[in-house]
Amino acid sequence: MEVLMAERANLVFHNKAIDGTAMKRLISRLIEHFGMAYTSHILDQVKTLGFQQATATSISLGIDDLLTIPSKGWLVQDAEQQSLILEKHHHYGNVHAVEKLRQSIEIWYATSEYLRQEMNPNFRMTDPFNPVHIMSFSGARGNASQVHQLVGMRGLMSDPQGQMIDLPIQSNLREGLSLTEYIISCYGARKGVVDTAVRTSDAGYLTRRLVEVVQHIVVRRTDCGTARGISVSPRNGMMPERIFSQTLIGRVLADDIYMGPRCIATRNQDIGIGLVNRFITFRAQPISIRTPFTCRSTSWICRLCYGRSPTHGDLVELGEAVGIIAGQSIGEPGTQLTLRTFHTGGVFTGGTAEHVRAPSNGKIKFNEDLVHPTRTRHGHPAFLCSIDLYVTIESEDILHNVNIPPKSLLLVQNDQYVESEQVIAEIRAGISTLNFKEKVRKHIYSDSDGEMHWSTDVYHAPEFTYGNVHLLPKTSHLWILLGGPCKSSLVYLSIHKDQDQMNAHSLSGKQRYTSNLSVTNDQARQKLFSSGFSGKKEDRIPDYSDLNRIICTGQYNLVYSPILHENSDLLSKRRRNKFIIPLHSIQELENELMPCSGISIEIPVNGIFRRNSILAYFDDPRYRRKSSGIIKYGTIETHSVIKKEDLIEYRGVKEFRPKYQMKVDRFFFIPEEVHILPGSSSIMVRNNSIVGVDTQITLNLRSRVGGLVRVERKKKRIELKIFSGDIHFPGETDKISRHTGLLIPPGTGKINSKESKKVKKWIYVQRITPSKKKFFVLVRPVVTYEITDGINFETLFPPDPLQERDNVQLRIVNYILYGNGKPIRGISDTSIQLVRTCLVLNWNQDKKSSSCEEARASFVEIRTNGLIRHFLRINLVKSPISYIGKRNDPSGSGLLSDNGSDCTNINPFSSIYSYSKAKIQQSLNQPQGTIHTLLNRNKECQSLIILSSANCSRMGTLKYHSVIKDSIKKDPLIPIRNSLGPLGTCLPIENFYSSYRLITHNQILVTNYLQLDNLKQTFQVIKFKYYLMDENGKIFNPDPCRNIILNPFNLNWYFLHHNYCEETSKIISLGQFICENVCIAKNGPPLKSGQVILVQVDSIVIRSAKPYLATPGATVHGHYGETLYEGDTLVTFIYEKSRSGDITQGLPKVEQVLEVRSIDSISMNLEKRVEGWNKCITRILGIPWGFLIGAELTIAQSRISLVNKIQQVYRSQGVQIHNRHIEIIVRQITSKVLVSEDGMSNVFSPGELIGLLRAERMGRALEEAICYRVVLLGITRASLNTQSFISEASFQETARVLAKAALRGRIDWLKGLKENVVLGGVIPVGTGFKGLVHPSKQHNNIPLETKKKNLFEGEMRDILFHHRKLFDSCLSKKFHDIPEQSFIGFNDS
């Protein structure tokens, strides 16, 4: 009793509120001092005391007790103001979505936190005995967070996936929620019955799987005699002391520990609190402890490796089922924590960074060499300092020095004036915070339909070389040029192949139009690869892509012009078939291009023509048929224009396709009705029967014509043809009837001897034999077509006063689209074109242009008198490799670029102004004779312009050239910008009726070079017009009075009128992307964001576009110039966010780690590093034992990191689990190796999973290396790969496990608990444990001192030390010369 009194005198007197944690500590100390019985008595007294006091207090709660905080109104208003500014920045493209999300979360989080801190003082001042206040701080039910929701604001919520919803709930529960807020609350609350039930069952299942893995682990021996341990060091400062002591208490030392010469702890001594404190104060060397990892056996564990039992504080007893305890200790917090969710109700919690503020007003100075610019996580510009930075602030009378720690962000510039208390730097939150970060992908979706552009180079992700996933190397904008994609109904989708003609009204459908990629894409690519740029001229294919074409259909001109996705060069070009169709209404149809006819001008996208290629074709409406049929040329000789059928079958540069050109002027069309039916359909008519018009053929099909029915059954379908015509049963003497398939001209022979009748029209005779003896002749009507010379294409190109077409010849060719005797199928009421008239382009082989193999053509649109005219320009090109230009250029305008004047990229659109034939000859000989060629530095291009004659007149002043030449030489005022861009000039000359705007594509963009004084005497200079024309020959030429419909791109034009002054023209270049709110004129209105496509003297036209900011490392989906739809994924950001403090995010993470499901993307080179390292170990350690040691090192490293990962999740929840429980589980999932195929060992079959120790023993016995590699099994797989098949079968897949066990003849030794429970035996633990403890051999321990701090290196040292005996047998002398330290530390290098 006296002893007890003495101990009582030593006890501490607590005079403070005791919460749950303090209570836990108190109970554990009571148990240590007094034991269990006495403690339970004390706790009873505490319980009684608590209930008495609560009854006496009798707190009640009413709605009036909820007092709201007065300062809430203006705080919320302030936060809303900030969010509004942020939204604007995002709209302008200054911050991207992730930065916006982060910042808005932080704004609202700070507001909410401030309100929470206000809450307490507010209650204290107004009403200290408020029941809400008392309850929330009693620690009983409810906490500050809940009270904050009642009287402050609910704040931000997370959705079921744990992502933040960036719409905060501004009301509290006292004021009541709006509808939106209520719905968001329903997301966040997550205390729905279903939700909790599902989570509880998840946690329960996790526990079951965990127990399944480790149920057989029992303490069987006192000491397994291992010499290994894991070293733990207090020194490196990374591990907080609390965690350090937690790791050590209750463990057993694996090594003696020396403090200088003095030994302060011996091997196999268990560690208590006193010893830990001694270690911490002495800062001893790394302490080597025994853990379940180091125990020698995998099927049981020894007392010393396990350590103290957590229940009573002594070494664990023999026969204790530590495996099941471990499984349940890890699973149990899961079940508890799922029920915890509704405390916070899903309210988001996060951390804010610390700030450094300026001590006084003054100018700030720092060394700029020590910082480098970066973006903060909110997208603001800042400086990052890598080492300590001293910042001085000079105020009027005093210098302040502020030290900024490394890795901080400096938010001010050098020499900037700061005010007192202004934030000048932000310190990154330290590593000590427990809630750790996770990587999250965020997809950004497009808000509108449009065309995608980006303003920087992109990389291809290595695994998607051909895909459309690109990595951004630097911060840049992605632009979506607005417009609606071409819509087409499904009917047309089936009919229109790529390149077919379409009427304008067919674009009115609702479906998305997807053009069919041609099958021959790959062949074309192979052909390109095979021929490459070799010397064979005839083999080289300049480009393959779709063709431009203009189709004049009534009111509209449709220009099909696909957008190419160009990678760096021609060979890797991949085609995306996209259309852009500008529709221009033409008012003067009668003297415009051919009125209302279907002339199609075909221009390849790159505009390159070969000789004899088809320039335009015309589909004559006279040669159109609605019905199916067969084309016959009769006996007339035909020949194919190109004999090789497969020369160029893909859609690229169209030379003559293998069509058939007639030598004569007529061909015949034999109509027939064809139905192609699926093989399963039931037909209501018989073969060779005769039907009338509108006869039922199948259930939903009626015949359109009457006649003879022929049914052919093919593999999977039935072809049913109906031939109209007369049937004759001829006599034997008839000669004609013996032939079949003849065309008979009018006025010849007798059809039947009885009725001698002259044939009035052409007929087609076909012999039909229904049976062997009978036959009859079918006489079918024939439609005859005469082929005229075709239309005169001179109407398309009117007579030319400039007579420039000396060099280029056009000839007209008719060809028939179908071969002789080929059947023609019509599909659902479309007309079939039989004959096509072509315009073939050719040019002379004169000496100067003898190298010209190809011409380049493009459309020129010229507005004359308010009308839009199309002109076709054909340039003869010399250089064979001139069009391999990259699409991305430095100036960001997205046009063709070449840097400087390099000759391989000859710009195709340099054009020559010329006004008479003499001048033309002169200009062709001396290209520098005109203003354009003077500006164009490449002298090798010749080009011709085909101008309409309507507005041309002859002009013969020589003075004109010289004046310009001289003035350009001497006038220094011309601003020449060395950036690329298209250029349009307006050249008014007095004799001209009206002004021309010709589009050129020069290397130099000259803004206002015509305002020269000398010119003003001769010419009257009007205003400029600039055009945007990209290298595909697309021209945007808007009429400023109204919107032009670009279908598929309804361009949202935006017109800006302002006084166009000189400095403005320098700011704006064509094709430039402009962010919203950038002011271009001094007092002009702010712009909307978009791409500049027209610049005039007093206005510019901008095509609306939406910018999206993307930071480095983001992946861009889709190709440059691709059409995107609303809701398509544009960019994926990968960013880190701190996990919210809710276990619902934690439990799945634990499960992911234990089931070994990888979520992080591991960089490629990491693997290679580790592989190389393993190889070098194998080399050092000699072959036979290399596998063993490599495997053990890998296992050691992965075990430690797995334990840390799982502990992190639980610690972040404030749950304490002892490491050894996790270690027992991790040991089970890492103790298997997979036998690999390399070594043909006779013991194990390849692919078999065996225990590491078993492989090691077997290798020793066989004295040969068994090849295996380490695998991490998930807990489910580990449960299905145990020693006992009964235990496996009772877990999952019973039938499969039992069948396999039977086939293999497995034996179950009934060592674990579960097998015995299933069979009803005594379980081998506790009293059922037959304690045959072998006296463990004491090894002579050689203490090893190491200088390394890393856990992993310590473990590695032990492995190497453990296998010292192995080295001696298999290593040469040289190895012993290497000091031990060098091969312990070889992973440092």
From Swiss-Prot:
Organism, scientific name: Atropa belladonna (Belladonna)
Subunit: In plastids the minimal PEP RNA polymerase catalytic core is composed of four subunits: alpha, beta, beta', and beta''. When a (nuclear-encoded) sigma factor is associated with the core the holoenzyme is formed, which can initiate transcription.
Family: Belongs to the RNA polymerase beta' chain family. RpoC2 subfamily.
GO molecular function, one term: DNA-directed RNA polymerase activity
Catalytic reaction list: RNA(n) + a ribonucleoside 5'-triphosphate = RNA(n+1) + diphosphate
Biological-process GO terms, alphabetical: DNA-templated transcription
EC nos: 2.7.7.6
Pfam families assigned to the protein according to its UniProt record, in alphabetical order: RNA_pol_Rpb1_4 (PF05000), RNA_pol_Rpb1_5 (PF04998)
InterPro entries: DNA-dir_RpoC2_beta_pp (IPR012756), RNA_pol_beta''_euk (IPR050254), RNA_pol_Rpb1_3_sf (IPR042102), RNA_pol_Rpb1_4 (IPR007083), RNA_pol_Rpb1_5 (IPR007081), Rpb1_funnel_sf (IPR038120)
EC primary class: transferase
Keywords, ordered alphabetically: Chloroplast, DNA-directed RNA polymerase, Metal-binding, Nucleotidyltransferase, Plastid, Transcription, Transferase, Zinc
Necessary cofactors: Zn(2+)
A cellular component term, taken from the record's GO annotations: chloroplast
Subcellular location: Plastid, Chloroplast
Protein name (record): DNA-directed RNA polymerase subunit beta''
Entry's cofactor comment: Binds 1 Zn(2+) ion per subunit.
Primary gene name: rpoC2
Function according to Swiss-Prot or TrEMBL: DNA-dependent RNA polymerase catalyzes the transcription of DNA into RNA using the four ribonucleoside triphosphates as substrates.
Binding sites annotated in the UniProt record for Zn(2+): C224, C295, C302, C305
